[in-house]
Amino acid sequence: MSRDLHTTAGKIEDLRDRVEEAIHAGSERAVEKQHSKGKKSARERIDLLVDPDSFTEIDEFARHRSTQFGMEKNRPYGDGVVIGTATVDGRPIALYSQDFTVMGGSLGEVHAEKIVKIAEFALKSGIPLIGINDSGGARIQEGVASLNGYGKIFRLNTRSSGVIPQISLILGPCAGGSAYSPALTDFTVMVNETSHMFITGPDVIKTVTGEEVGMEELGGARTHNTRTGNSHYLAENEDDAIDYVKALLSYLPSNNMDATPHLPPTETLEKKASDIALDTLIPDSPNQPYDMKVLIQALVDEGEFLEVHALYAPNIVVCIESVNLKEFTFINKSLNQHLHVIRLIWAIRNQRIKCDI
C-alpha cells in the first residue's frame, strides 16, 4: 500500500514501518537458530537487563555504507548492534547489544561508530557502560574500516578506565578484534558452554601450529574463569549472567566522583549468634585452615556479599559488600585453599582487583 509522504499521516506510518523493520532486522530463521542454541536476541537481552519501558534507542536507522562484495544489496537497519540508554533499579546506564542475527554481529564501520557514540556518551555523562557481546569479529567485507573502528573502541575503553564502570557480558562468540575490548573493561561475565572468547579460532591454530584444540579449551567460559582470569563470573545461563550484572551494579558508584548507591539501614548493633561464633572461628593451631567466607559473612550487612573471580586463584577471596551502609572490597586469603601460600596466580588476581579499585 503506497503512502503519501507529503502528509503527516503518511510520514507517521512510514516511520512506524521503519521502526518495525529495525526491531526485526534479523531474519526469522536467524532468530530461530539463535534460540535453538539457548541464546536470546539482542533486544530480549536488553529487556531482561533494564527497568521496564526505560530503554531509549539511539541510531536505530543507521546502515552501513559499504559497496564492496555486493554489500549494497544488504543494508539492514541498526547494522548489527543496538545502542541506547536505560535505567537499572532506577539508576541510569548506557549500553550496547550486538545482534548476531544480523551479519553475525560482525563489526563494520557504522557498527563501530555506534558503539563509540554510546561509549562517549557514558563517559561524558558519568554513567556505567554495559556491553553485550555476541560477534564473529571484524566484518571482512569492510576491510581496514573495521579495524579502525576497533581502535576507536579500545581507545575509549582505556580513557574510561577508572572513571566509569565498564562491564562486558559475553553471551556468544567473541572472536578476533572483539576479544580485546572485554579484556580492557572492569568486569567480564561469561556463560558456561555458550560463551567463547579468543583472538584466533581452532581452525587457524591447527593450520598454523598443527595443534588441535577445541573451542571450550581454547576460549570457553570455564577456561577464562579458571585459567586466564579474563572472566570474573561463570554463569549457568543468560538469565544468571544478567542477574549477576544487575547485582554488581547495585554495589558500584556511577563514576569515580559519585558516592556508592544508598542502601536502607537494616542492621542493628545487637549481638547475634553469628557474632559469637567468630570467637571460635580461628583455630588455635596456625596450621589448621578455616573458612574466610564465614568471617566475611558475619562482618557485612545482611550477611550478603558479591564474590568476584570465584574460580580463579581460589586461595584468595575477593568480594564486594557493604558494611554499615558503606561499600567495600574485601581481599582475603582463603585459608581453606593452599594454607599461607602466595602463588603467582594469587598475586596477579590481588594486583588486578586493586588496580580496578
Please place each PLM-identified region on the residue numbering:
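Terminal-region recognition feature
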Residues: 1-167, 173, 178-180, 184-204, ...
